[in-house]
């Protein structure tokens, strides 16, 4: 296999893990593109992205254009004479002229099994929908949003205890291996391209804080999926006496209840059981305002009065029952 001259474009830690795999591979990373440095921390000092930091550690040229629609930025990229551009969570739109610049085009690492979940939040939407598996797709980029031909897929079962956080970590391990495998196939010309079936496509919209409000009229199983999908952000929550209480972990109880949805049925060290629109949800880890996430057992030691059986919890932040 002849090593490829690769431009890598990415920004967060997830992308940096893929860059490290390329650095460790037979291919040559000739340049890195990443978002401009952003103010961070209390002092609001400019901070380099994880991808930039890794590139500088390895003496790789770094480019940080504000936009790739700029003709000078496009000319700068073209002058690199890359074989291929690898894009992982970059954050900038790549116009067609950029997609067509490298000899073999641009490929993307996408955190789902396409075309099931296109868009910004495929990990979270897969959990919320109750999917039993997810994975990584290596895709040839085109001008659409995650609509390009699929080059390689890897599958990952979704376990009952998975959250968006744990799936992120698993896919961050799986993705780099898939990327290096795909590049080997591309270099050898042995990787067939597969068209996406548009009838199977869904759009994974970015999450919002509003979506994370718990609605007790939903089935317990749906709330359980939401809580896992919104961990670690924006975190499922409900309001009680003007306080936002975040819910980090839960389970679906074997109990049944005819009580009004939102009614606290029991509260002990094993969890807080709440009636829902269908079934009973047991909360096992929560976070009170200004505090860190704690087990229900620890929270009941200090605020048992907030979780008295018979209390009916509101489903929105503007109404208390």
From Swiss-Prot:
InterPro entries: Fmt, Formyl_trans_C, Formyl_trans_C_sf, Formyl_transf_N, Formyl_transf_N_sf, Formyl_transferase-like_C_sf, GART_AS, Met-tRNA-FMT_C. One of its GO terms (cellular component) is cytosol. Its EC number is 2.1.2.9. Keywords: Protein biosynthesis, Transferase. PROSITE patterns: GART. (6S)-5,6,7,8-tetrahydrofolate binds at residues 112-115. It is an enzyme of class 2 (transferase). It comes from the Bacteria. Pfam families: Formyl_trans_C (PF02911), Formyl_trans_N (PF00551). GO terms for molecular function: methionyl-tRNA formyltransferase activity. It catalyses: L-methionyl-tRNA(fMet) + (6R)-10-formyltetrahydrofolate = N-formyl-L-methionyl-tRNA(fMet) + (6S)-5,6,7,8-tetrahydrofolate + H(+). Attaches a formyl group to the free amino group of methionyl-tRNA(fMet). The formyl group appears to play a dual role in the initiator identity of N-formylmethionyl-tRNA by promoting its recognition by IF2 and preventing the misappropriation of this tRNA by the elongation apparatus. NCBIfam families: fmt (TIGR00460). Belongs to the Fmt family. This is Methionyl-tRNA formyltransferase. It comes from Shewanella pealeana (strain ATCC 700345 / ANG-SQ1).
């Amino acid at each position: 296999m002849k090593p490829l001259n690769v431009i890598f474009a990415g920004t967060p830690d997830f992308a940096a893990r893929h860059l490290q795999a390329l650095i460790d591979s037979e291919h040559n990373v000739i340049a890195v593109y990443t978002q401009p440095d952003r103010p961070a921390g209390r002092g609001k000092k400019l901070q380099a992205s994880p991808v930039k930091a890794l590139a500088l550690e390895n003496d790789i040229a770094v480019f940080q254009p504000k936009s790739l629609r700029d003709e000078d930025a496009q000319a700068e990229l073209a002058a690199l004479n890359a074989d291929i551009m690898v894009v992982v969570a970059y954050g900038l739109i790549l116009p067609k002229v950029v997609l067509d610049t490298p000899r073999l085009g641009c490929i993307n690492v996408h955190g789902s099994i396409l075309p099931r979940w296109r868009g910004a939040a495929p990990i979270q939407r897969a959990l919320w929908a109750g999917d039993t598996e997810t994975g990584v797709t290596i895709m040839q980029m085109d001008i659409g949003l995650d609509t390009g031909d699929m080059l390689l897929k890897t599958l990952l079962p979704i376990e009952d205890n998975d959250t968006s956080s744990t799936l992120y970590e698993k896919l961050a391990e799986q993705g780099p291996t898939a990327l290096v495998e795909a590049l080997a196939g591309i270099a050898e010309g042995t990787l067939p391209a597969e068209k996406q079936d548009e009838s199977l496509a869904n759009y994974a919209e970015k999450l919002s804080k509003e979506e994370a409000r718990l609605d007790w009229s939903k089935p317990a199983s749906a709330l359980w999926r939401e809580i896992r999908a919104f961990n670690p952000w924006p975190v499922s929550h409900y309001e009680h006496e003007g306080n936002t209480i975040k819910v980090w972990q839960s389970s679906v109880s074997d109990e049944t209840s005819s009580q009004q949805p939102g009614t606290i049925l029991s509260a002990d060290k094993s969890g807080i059981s709440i009636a829902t629109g269908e079934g009973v949800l047991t909360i096992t880890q929560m976070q009170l305002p200004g505090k860190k996430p704690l087990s229900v057992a620890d929270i009941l030691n200090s605020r048992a009065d907030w979780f008295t059986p018979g209390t009916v919890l509101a489903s929105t932040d503007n109404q208390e029952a």
